[in-house]
Regions:
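Surface-exposed loop/interface segments of Gram-negative outer-membrane beta-barrel transport/assembly proteins
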Residues: 104-184, 263-293, 355-369
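Face-selective signature of the C-terminal outer-membrane beta-barrel domain
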Residues: 197-227, 233, 238-369
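Outer-membrane beta-barrel proteins
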Residues: 35-43, 66-91, 105-111, 121-122, 173-206, ...
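Outer-membrane beta-barrel pore domains and translocons
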Residues: 2, 20, 33-39, 62-66, ...
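Transmembrane beta-barrel wall of Gram-negative outer-membrane proteins
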Residues: 29, 36-67, 72-110, 117-163, ...
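N-terminal periplasmic accessory domains that precede
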Residues: 9-33, 44-50
Length: 369
C-alpha cells in the first residue's frame, strides 16, 4: 500500500510493509554521505531535518545522486532520488502529514543471455557435458578479441555498440515532460536502456474525535512515466568475426556472440541508395533531402500510469475487550502502454506496418506512437 496508515494486508498480494518516516521524530540537523564502488559507481546523499518548529511543525528532506559506468560493459546508471516529509499539528485533535518520494533514473541494460563459452571458454570446457568443440578455434563461440569495436569476454554485453560521434541525431524519451536530447554518450549507443520515474505523494490527516474514537484519512497519488528501449525494423548485425549480414550473408550463420553495426544503419538510413540489404533481404526505401526513409530504428516501449486513491479508517474502542474498525479503500487508475520512435538513426521517418488501419503503412517521426 506504500506510504499509508492502513495496517490491513489485504488485498495486497503477499502483504504490506509500511515504513513510517515521521519528520517530527528527527532533531534539527543534516548529514552528507558519499559512497564509491566498482565500475565507476558514485553515490552522494544529502539529508536535512528542521526539527520541531514552534512545537507543531517539522520538515525533512533527502536527495540522492547516483552515477556509474557499470562492471559489465556499458551498463551505466544515471539516477536521482528524493524524499520530502512535512508534519503539522494544527491542534490537539488534528494533525496533517505530507510525503513525496520518487527516483527518476536511466540505466544501460544487459538483457540477452549468452552461451557460457562466449564469456569464458576455458571454464565452459571444464563443465561436465559441455561440448569443447563449441569454443575451439573453429567453434561456435568466441570469448576473446573483438568485432566492430565491441570486446568479448566476461564483461561482454550485446546490448551496445560503438557509433561515430559525427552522428548527432537526437533521441526522444518522455519522463514527466517531453525530452528530445542527445544520447547518453556520443561514442556508443545502447540498444536496451531503461528509464522510469514513479513518484508517490501522500496527504495524511489524523483526527481525534474523542478519547475512544480516531479517524485517519489518506489521499494519495501514484504516478509512473518511462519505459524501455529496443530495436524496430531491420538492423545490420555482424557475427563474432566481423562479417556483416548483407546481400549474400546472414549474421547468424557465423560465430557468436553477435554485434550491432550502428554506423552501417545510419549510412543506410541517411544514404541515397534505392535498395539496401540486411541479412539477404532487399529493403526498398525512398530518399532525398528531408525524405530519407529509415529501414531500422530504436523504439521506446512506454508505460505511463496514474493512480488516485483514498484510504480512510475509523477506530472505535467500545471497551478494553472490544475494539471496532471501519474503513474504505477507493482508487482509480489509468495506464497507457505503447511504442514510440526513440531514434530514427539517420533517417527522417519510418514506415510502420503494425497498425491495421494503415494498409500501406504509416509514416512516423521522432516521438510518434
Amino acid at each position: 500500500r506504500g506510504l499509508s496508515a492502513v495496517n490491513l494486508a489485504t488485498p495486497s498480494i503477499g502483504g504490506t510493509m509500511n515504513i513510517i518516516t515521521d519528520p517530527t521524530a528527527h532533531s534539527r540537523g543534516g548529514r552528507f554521505k558519499t559512497e564509491i564502488g566498482a565500475g565507476g559507481f558514485l553515490k552522494a546523499t544529502v539529508n536535512y531535518n528542521t526539527g520541531l518548529i514552534n512545537d507543531n511543525m517539522a520538515f525533512s528532506t533527502t536527495i540522492v545522486r547516483k552515477v556509474g559506468d557499470g562492471v559489465i560493459d556499458k551498463t551505466w546508471t544515471d539516477a536521482w532520488a528524493y524524499y520530502f516529509g512535512a508534519s503539522y499539528q494544527m491542534n490537539d485533535a488534528n494533525r496533517f502529514e505530507l510525503y513525496a518520494i520518487g527516483a527518476p533514473q536511466r540505466h544501460g541494460q544487459n538483457l540477452y543471455k549468452q552461451n557460457l563459452g562466449a564469456y569464458d571458454a576455458e571454464f565452459a570446457a571444464s563443465v561436465e557435458g559441455y561440448d569443447a568443440v563449441a569454443v575451439s578455434d573453429t567453434g561456435q563461440f568466441r570469448d576473446s578479441g573483438e568485432a566492430g569495436g565491441v570486446g568479448f569476454g566476461r564483461t561482454f554485453n550485446q546490448n551496445w555498440a560503438p557509433i561515430n560521434s559525427s552522428y548527432t541525431g537526437e533521441q526522444y524519451w518522455y519522463m514527466y515532460g517531453a525530452n528530445t536530447v542527445a544520447r547518453h554518450d556520443p561514442n556508443f549507443l545502447n540498444e536496451r536502456e531503461n528509464f522510469f520515474h514513479k513518484p508517490l505523494v501522500n496527504l495524511n490527516h489524523y483526527l481525534t474525535l474523542s478519547d475512544n474514537m480516531r479517524l485517519s484519512t489518506i489521499l494519495y497519488w501514484s504516478g509512473g512515466s518511462g519505459g524501455g528501449t529496443g530495436t524496430y525494423g531491420k538492423i545490420p548485425t555482424m557475427d563474432a568475426d566481423g562479417n556483416l549480414g548483407d546481400d549474400d550473408y546472414k549474421f547468424y550463420y557465423g560465430r557468436g556472440p553477435w554485434v550491432r553495426d550502428w554506423n552501417t544503419l545510419v549510412a543506410y538510413n541517411s544514404g541515397d541508395e534505392d535498395t539496401v540489404y540486411v541479412d539477404k533481404s532487399a529493403l526498398a526505401r525512398t530518399h532525398g533531402a528531408g525524405n530519407n526513409q529509415s529501414v531500422g530504428i530504436l523504439r521506446n516501449s512506454i508505460n505511463r500510469q496514474n493512480t488516485y486513491g483514498v484510504i480512510s479508517k475509523l477506530n472505535f474502542d467500545m471497551s478494553d475487550a472490544l475494539k471496532l474498525q471501519f474503513g474504505i479503500d477507493w482508487r482509480t487508475a489509468g495506464i497507457e502502454h505503447a511504442r514510440e520512435v526513440r531514434d530514427l538513426m539517420g533517417g527522417d521517418y519510418y514506415v510502420d506496418f503494425a497498425d491495421d488501419n494503415f494498409a500501406d503503412g504509416k509514416e512516423v517521426g521522432l516521438g510518434d506512437i
